[in-house]
Amino acid sequence: MAQPPPDVEGDDCLPAYRHLFCPDLLRDKVAFITGGGSGIGFRIAEIFMRHGCHTVIASRSLPRVLTAARKLAGATGRRCLPLSMDVRAPPAIVAAVDQALKEFGRIDILINCAAGNFLCPAGALSFNAFKTVMDIDTSGTFNVSRVLYEKFFRDHGGVIVNITATLGNRGQALQVHAGSAKAAVDAMTRHLAVEWGPQNIRVNSLAPGPISGTEGLRRLGGPQASLSTKVTASPLQRLGNKTEIAHSVLYLASPLASYVTGAVLVADGGAWLTFPNDVKGLADFASFSAKL
């Protein structure tokens, strides 16, 4: 069985990296990555930059992306522009994209990675909490995609990769908000692939499973003993890591996937096929994690 590539737990760059793809796969391309200051988004930025790409990393937290950009540029030697931006605010997106275009003159790739999630029973979920997740995950993905379409992709082509999830595939307990939001994004992926394909724009989704070293796993994974049992029951019997997800996104964003559009690539080790969907167990963990 293939061994996973090395990874580190926190938001730090890899101490060493062995290229599985050509090192200049994205040479001098520019990628705009929402949620790029931490977690999976941070690792996507790093792996892209290690393949010759310059990046723009956008997040609501300017200190976070400033710190991330210094780490990324130092480790890879490529340029990284940190920007403060809320995906729910179209004027802020327009300003950020304008600044990125002024800095680089082009944007070739958009990675929609900004997201919000937590465990909550549907009957206890506030109207505002549901709306907030939909606004960030679904509306935010559309907002950034539409602005980049108008500002650059319509006339120059481009690639969009939306980071989604498998929650909606089976109706995951305590995840009606995130599952609905991400399922809507997968539908959006197909709609935009059809409408924007003639402008040489490819649009795909990447749906990760449980990934080590992420805030999502801490919030959603459950107690360690319970998580270990779930992982052992999954087909590959291990968690994924951020580098593996970044490699999958790299494939979709690169010329290797030049004839792939409107697709959802699931990168979860088969976990969605076997992970338990235990409402009571998840509810107990949600109650516990809310106190952390």
Curated annotation (Swiss-Prot):
Substrate binds at R60, R88, F118, S126, F127, N128, R219. The keyword Lipid metabolism applies. Keywords: Acetylation, Fatty acid metabolism, Lipid metabolism, NADP, Oxidoreductase, Peroxisome, Phosphoprotein. Its EC number is 1.3.1.124. The modification N-acetylalanine is found at A2. GO terms for cellular component: peroxisome. It catalyses: a (2E,4Z)-dienoyl-CoA + NADPH + H(+) = a 4,5-saturated-(3E)-enoyl-CoA + NADP(+); a (2E,4E)-dienoyl-CoA + NADPH + H(+) = a 4,5-saturated-(3E)-enoyl-CoA + NADP(+); (2E,4E)-hexadienoyl-CoA + NADPH + H(+) = (3E)-hexenoyl-CoA + NADP(+); (2E,4E)-decadienoyl-CoA + NADPH + H(+) = (3E)-decenoyl-CoA + NADP(+). A motif (Microbody targeting signal) lies at residues 290-292. It is an enzyme of class 1 (oxidoreductase). Monomer, dimer and oligomer. Belongs to the short-chain dehydrogenases/reductases (SDR) family. 2,4-dienoyl-CoA reductase subfamily. This is Peroxisomal 2,4-dienoyl-CoA reductase [(3E)-enoyl-CoA-producing]. It comes from Pongo abelii. The lineage of its organism: Eukaryota, Metazoa, Chordata, Craniata, Vertebrata. The gene is DECR2.
